[in-house]
């Protein structure tokens, strides 16, 4: 007849428990029956960690009884008042304008523009892609329009990365100029 024992509770003494001392085994069954109701807690001193855990469990039980919730908090469903009301959620739709925006405030981005600087898509065919010649012409027009003539102007010689040749020839073995003598030993 085993009772369900909580993990953190101190086990009680039962008649099924056998003493380790053989001299104590000679105790009569009447003595065991008298001790059956007693707790081993009288001889057992719990560790400070066990005492702390037991206090936390008791506080949790009292808190759950105060709130009227039974069972573990994980199994509880969320309360409906935790969800924001639908009327408080502002979901922008197409054509949405903020109600609290005053008429003197300008939006950050103007979406409707009729400027001539817009890219003209009518020049390109709708079949997927344009020919390479048409793209090349468009690039040249854009470069000329922006003031760049990169293909027509040759590179500046001052920008070459190859250093210019020196006026005085040098000897590779001792780095001496023509005015000094170079002696190989």
From Swiss-Prot:
The keyword Acetylation applies. It holds the Pfam family FAM219A. Keywords: Acetylation, Phosphoprotein. Residues 122-131 have a biased composition (Low complexity). InterPro entries: FAM219. Residues 52-61 have a biased composition (Basic and acidic residues). The modification N-acetylmethionine is found at residue 1. The modification Phosphoserine is found at residues 47, 72, 102, 115, 122. Residues 66-80 have a biased composition (Polar residues). The modification Phosphothreonine is found at residue 113. Residues 1-131 are annotated as: Disordered. Belongs to the FAM219 family. This is Protein FAM219A.
């Amino acid at each position: 007849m085993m009772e369900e024992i909580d993990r953190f509770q101190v086990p009680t003494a039962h008649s099924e428990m056998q003493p380790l001392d053989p001299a104590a085994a000679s105790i009569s069954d009447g003595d065991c029956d008298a001790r059956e109701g007693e707790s081993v807690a009288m001889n057992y001193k719990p560790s400070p960690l066990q005492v702390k855990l037991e206090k936390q469990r008791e506080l949790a039980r009292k808190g759950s009884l105060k709130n009227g919730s039974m069972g573990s908090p994980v199994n509880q469903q969320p309360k409906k008042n935790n969800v924001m009301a639908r009327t408080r959620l502002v979901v922008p739709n197409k054509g949405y304008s903020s109600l609290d925006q005053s008429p003197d405030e300008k939006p950050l981005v103007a979406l409707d523009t009729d400027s001539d600087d817009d890219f003209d898509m009518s020049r390109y065919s709708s079949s997927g892609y344009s020919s390479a010649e048409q793209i090349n012409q468009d690039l040249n027009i854009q470069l000329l329009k922006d003031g760049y003539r990169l293909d027509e102007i040759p590179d500046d010689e001052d920008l070459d990365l190859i250093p210019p040749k020196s006026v005085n020839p040098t000897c590779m073995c001792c780095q001496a100029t023509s005015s000094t003598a170079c002696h190989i030993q």
